[in-house]
Amino acid sequence: MLQMPSKQPISAGIVIVAAGRGERAGSPTEGPKQYRPIGGKPVIVHTLENFMTWEPATAIVVVIHPDDEALFAKAFRHIISATPIETVHGGPTRQRSVLAGLRYLKDKHVSHVLIHDAVRPFFDHTLLDRIAENLANGALAVLPAMPVTDTLKRADGAGTVLTTVSREQLFAAQTPQSFAFETILDAHEKAAASGRSDFTDDASIAEWLGIPVTIVEGTGDNVKLTVKKDIAMADDKLSASLLPDVRTGNGYDVHQLEAGDGVTLCGVFIPHDQKLKGHSDADVALHALTDALLATCGAGDIGDHFPPSDPQWKGAASRIFIEHAARIVRERGGTIMNADVSLIAEAPKVGPHREAMRANLSEYLGIDLERCSVKATTNETIGFVGRREGIAAIATATVVYRGRT
């Protein structure tokens, strides 16, 4: 609990309004905007994390749409919080959703409440402390707001300008809008009982009942993510500020040699008096590199995706496996930066085919040739490799995952 320089401390309940559908934020198949990723995490997680680390917050309730329970549960996996976080279902309007959250907090023994839009993730503790100081000093309602700086025009229904509106004493309201708890709960209950459902924010309900609302300075970053472009800009902003998430994966594979007419390594067929034994084409190099790529995002290994017991992969080209792994990496936000393969074999000689192998890796992975390396060494006639009983491969992949913490 944060003791302000005032006569009373603040014990704050937090209501996060997250029941909206976000029709203006793109295709419905993309999901509600509060669950879209920015900087590697859902919008709502960024919002919650700001409140979770604010000392006066003693209870947090997130008001969600009934259809979004699975989405919230998935987002909640990102969260470790000492402050209790609960959910309730919202109503058909923002006003009804807020009331549901307030009713939930009735037995949580909070003195004040901050009501915040889930899709405003860019507030900070300085703003919260400014609000709390005013509440602690006796304000019944506190509204963060910014002076209007754009020129405002009033137009008729046809889009013709009627007049220029003075900006003096005009403010753009933000959230969290904050109140003495019993005051705003009573105001919301009275609004519901009166049949009024047209209030667009909580300060308006306080104004309707004559409750004085104190304005404190908001922040320019505390914007509401409304349309698809807002979400893209927010993602760029956060991703640019994060340290790069560089991951390295390793892979190892070995295949036996048997009598045959050649081996396939990195997709290149090399004539030889032996061949590699395996369920697919036994390209030991690509198998090792496939595992290395999958390792960078914890996606298992090649056997999980292409089990040797599955007859459809009998004799399959290993290009299928490596391109599958590269696709998984990209779907999870990764950019492949480097691929390195070391082959351990007594024969055949790899040197004459190295550039063709590198070219294949470049094509399969969709990266520049200079980012692909193929090396070879013998085992100095030691062990199964030295006895020409098999070929081994060690691979390393470096992947940068964008927008992860």
From Swiss-Prot:
<feature type="binding site">
    <location>
        <begin position="253"/>
        <end position="255"/>
    </location>
    <ligand>
        <name>4-CDP-2-C-methyl-D-erythritol 2-phosphate</name>
    </ligand>
</feature>
<feature type="site" description="Positions MEP for the nucleophilic attack">
    <location>
        <position position="167"/>
    </location>
</feature>
<dbReference type="GO" id="GO:0016114">
    <property type="term" value="P:terpenoid biosynthetic process"/>
</dbReference>
<dbReference type="GO" id="GO:0046872">
    <property type="term" value="F:metal ion binding"/>
</dbReference>
<dbReference type="GO" id="GO:0019288">
    <property type="term" value="P:isopentenyl diphosphate biosynthetic process, methylerythritol 4-phosphate pathway"/>
</dbReference>
<feature type="binding site">
    <location>
        <position position="253"/>
    </location>
    <ligand>
        <name>a divalent metal cation</name>
    </ligand>
</feature>
<keyword id="KW-0548">Nucleotidyltransferase</keyword>
<feature type="binding site">
    <location>
        <position position="384"/>
    </location>
    <ligand>
        <name>4-CDP-2-C-methyl-D-erythritol 2-phosphate</name>
    </ligand>
</feature>
<comment type="function">
    <text>Bifunctional enzyme that catalyzes the formation of 4-diphosphocytidyl-2-C-methyl-D-erythritol from CTP and 2-C-methyl-D-erythritol 4-phosphate (MEP) (IspD), and catalyzes the conversion of 4-diphosphocytidyl-2-C-methyl-D-erythritol 2-phosphate (CDP-ME2P) to 2-C-methyl-D-erythritol 2,4-cyclodiphosphate (ME-CPP) with a corresponding release of cytidine 5-monophosphate (CMP) (IspF).</text>
</comment>
<feature type="site" description="Transition state stabilizer">
    <location>
        <position position="378"/>
    </location>
</feature>
<feature type="site" description="Positions MEP for the nucleophilic attack">
    <location>
        <position position="224"/>
    </location>
</feature>
<dbReference type="InterPro" id="IPR003526">
    <property type="entry name" value="MECDP_synthase"/>
</dbReference>
<comment type="pathway">
    <text>Isoprenoid biosynthesis; isopentenyl diphosphate biosynthesis via DXP pathway; isopentenyl diphosphate from 1-deoxy-D-xylulose 5-phosphate: step 2/6.</text>
</comment>
<dbReference type="Pfam" id="PF02542">
    <property type="entry name" value="YgbB"/>
</dbReference>
<feature type="site" description="Transition state stabilizer">
    <location>
        <position position="279"/>
    </location>
</feature>
<dbReference type="InterPro" id="IPR018294">
    <property type="entry name" value="ISPD_synthase_CS"/>
</dbReference>
<dbReference type="InterPro" id="IPR001228">
    <property type="entry name" value="IspD"/>
</dbReference>
<feature type="binding site">
    <location>
        <position position="287"/>
    </location>
    <ligand>
        <name>a divalent metal cation</name>
    </ligand>
</feature>
<feature type="binding site">
    <location>
        <begin position="279"/>
        <end position="280"/>
    </location>
    <ligand>
        <name>4-CDP-2-C-methyl-D-erythritol 2-phosphate</name>
    </ligand>
</feature>
<feature type="region of interest" description="2-C-methyl-D-erythritol 2,4-cyclodiphosphate synthase">
    <location>
        <begin position="247"/>
        <end position="405"/>
    </location>
</feature>
<dbReference type="InterPro" id="IPR036571">
    <property type="entry name" value="MECDP_synthase_sf"/>
</dbReference>
<feature type="binding site">
    <location>
        <position position="255"/>
    </location>
    <ligand>
        <name>a divalent metal cation</name>
    </ligand>
</feature>
<keyword id="KW-0456">Lyase</keyword>
<protein>
    <recommendedName>
        <fullName>Bifunctional enzyme IspD/IspF</fullName>
        <ecNumber>2.7.7.60</ecNumber>
        <ecNumber>4.6.1.12</ecNumber>
    </recommendedName>
</protein>
<dbReference type="InterPro" id="IPR029044">
    <property type="entry name" value="Nucleotide-diphossugar_trans"/>
</dbReference>
<comment type="similarity">
    <text>In the C-terminal section; belongs to the IspF family.</text>
</comment>
<comment type="similarity">
    <text>In the N-terminal section; belongs to the IspD/TarI cytidylyltransferase family. IspD subfamily.</text>
</comment>
<keyword id="KW-0808">Transferase</keyword>
<dbReference type="GO" id="GO:0050518">
    <property type="term" value="F:2-C-methyl-D-erythritol 4-phosphate cytidylyltransferase activity"/>
</dbReference>
<comment type="pathway">
    <text>Isoprenoid biosynthesis; isopentenyl diphosphate biosynthesis via DXP pathway; isopentenyl diphosphate from 1-deoxy-D-xylulose 5-phosphate: step 4/6.</text>
</comment>
<feature type="site" description="Transition state stabilizer">
    <location>
        <position position="33"/>
    </location>
</feature>
<feature type="site" description="Transition state stabilizer">
    <location>
        <position position="24"/>
    </location>
</feature>
<feature type="binding site">
    <location>
        <begin position="377"/>
        <end position="380"/>
    </location>
    <ligand>
        <name>4-CDP-2-C-methyl-D-erythritol 2-phosphate</name>
    </ligand>
</feature>
<keyword id="KW-0479">Metal-binding</keyword>
<keyword id="KW-0414">Isoprene biosynthesis</keyword>
<feature type="binding site">
    <location>
        <begin position="301"/>
        <end position="303"/>
    </location>
    <ligand>
        <name>4-CDP-2-C-methyl-D-erythritol 2-phosphate</name>
    </ligand>
</feature>
<dbReference type="GO" id="GO:0008685">
    <property type="term" value="F:2-C-methyl-D-erythritol 2,4-cyclodiphosphate synthase activity"/>
</dbReference>
<dbReference type="InterPro" id="IPR020555">
    <property type="entry name" value="MECDP_synthase_CS"/>
</dbReference>
<feature type="region of interest" description="2-C-methyl-D-erythritol 4-phosphate cytidylyltransferase">
    <location>
        <begin position="1"/>
        <end position="246"/>
    </location>
</feature>
<keyword id="KW-0511">Multifunctional enzyme</keyword>
<dbReference type="Pfam" id="PF01128">
    <property type="entry name" value="IspD"/>
</dbReference>
<feature type="binding site">
    <location>
        <position position="387"/>
    </location>
    <ligand>
        <name>4-CDP-2-C-methyl-D-erythritol 2-phosphate</name>
    </ligand>
</feature>
